[in-house]
UniProtKB/Swiss-Prot annotation:
Domain notes: The presence of a 'disulfide through disulfide knot' structurally defines this protein as a knottin.
Superkingdom of the source species: Eukaryota
Post-translational modification: The C-terminal glycine may be removed from A1b.
Result for mutant: F50A: Decreased binding to globulin
Disulphide linkage map: C22-C39, C26-C41, C34-C51
Keyword terms of this UniProt record: Disulfide bond, Knottin, Seed storage protein, Signal, Storage protein, Toxin
Gene Ontology MF terms in the entry: nutrient reservoir activity; toxin activity
Propeptide segment residues: 57-64, 117-119
General function of this protein: A1b binds to basic 7S globulin (BG) and stimulates its phosphorylation activity. Involved in the signal transduction system to regulate the growth and differentiation as a hormone peptide.
Signal peptide: 1-19
Tagged with keyword Transport: no
Record-given protein name: Albumin-1
């Protein structure tokens, strides 16, 4: 009887698993990125990026290493010569930030952005 109920429940209530569509442009400030928790937004500019599926993260790690402004630490910014402060994106889905000079007006605007988007 239990086997019959189990078999009929899968027939009556089929589950459809769809893969996330991780294509197109995105904003590093968008939560969840790319309209799906299964995707990640990789910035190519301060406010714009492209969507990827996490299986492509090894190529993303290489891109972060090669991108002059993407960073994971202040030391990385100094090593790349693109600033001395790594400002993290206010998005839990993004594990890196953007390099700034710590006394720049651009940094002040970037740090004010999360407050502006949550109001």
């Amino acid at each position: 009887m239990a086997v019959f109920l189990l078999a009929t429940s899968t027939i009556m209530f089929p589950t459809k698993i769809e893969a996330a569509d991780c294509n197109g442009a995105c904003s590093p400030f968008e939560v969840p990125p790319c309209r799906s928790r299964d995707c990640r937004c990789v910035p190519i500019g301060l406010f714009v990026g492209f969507c990827i599926h996490p299986t492509g993260l090894s190529s993303v790690a290489k891109m972060i290493d090669e991108h002059p402004n993407l960073c994971q630490s202040d030391d990385e910014c100094m090593k790349k010569g693109s600033g001395n402060f790594c400002a993290r994106y206010p998005n839990n889905y993004i594990d890196y930030g953007w390099c700034f000079d710590s006394d720049s007006e651009a940094l002040k605007g970037f740090l004010a952005m999360p407050r502006a988007t949550t109001k």
